[in-house]
């Protein structure tokens, strides 16, 4: 289903590849999508196996000059962005336009912390992955391969959750006072 406004997807608990395929399909239909909390995405398989696969990927270089070519994004948002790019015809104008309609973030930045976030049931780990199977959290893998900002993002997330809880406590109080006042004046 197509909406004019951007859909904000909370990446926590989703499997990376499954979410990337759903996002790519939606992008090709013209939908704008924002994925937040990419550091909480999951990859099936134990950390050791995923680290070995990433080590193979990081060894890709150019034959003539190793300093040029093959830039490997290590942040969770770049890893997810690249996974989606691999599912789009990104060398065509249509694919490039689709890729321009996507934004990815670690954590939940300011404009999107007040917006309703959705999940994709067909990509949730608890739905699609057997409970006995091991999985890797993307922030841990990123940290192991060179991402330096895991602690910073975690600290900012704690601050955001505190702000959010105080906001909702105040909103609940206002709602309670309003219902009290309505009861008082209606009687």
Curated annotation (Swiss-Prot):
InterPro entries: Ribosomal_uL13, Ribosomal_uL13_CS, Ribosomal_uL13_euk/arc, Ribosomal_uL13_sf. Keywords: Ribonucleoprotein, Ribosomal protein. GO terms for biological process: negative regulation of translation; translation. Disulfide bonds: none annotated. GO terms for cellular component: cytosolic large ribosomal subunit; ribosome. The keyword Ribonucleoprotein applies. It comes from the Eukaryota. NCBIfam families: L13_A_E (TIGR01077). Belongs to the universal ribosomal protein uL13 family. PANTHER family: LARGE RIBOSOMAL SUBUNIT PROTEIN UL13, RIBOSOMAL PROTEIN L13. This is Large ribosomal subunit protein uL13. It comes from Dictyostelium discoideum (Social amoeba).
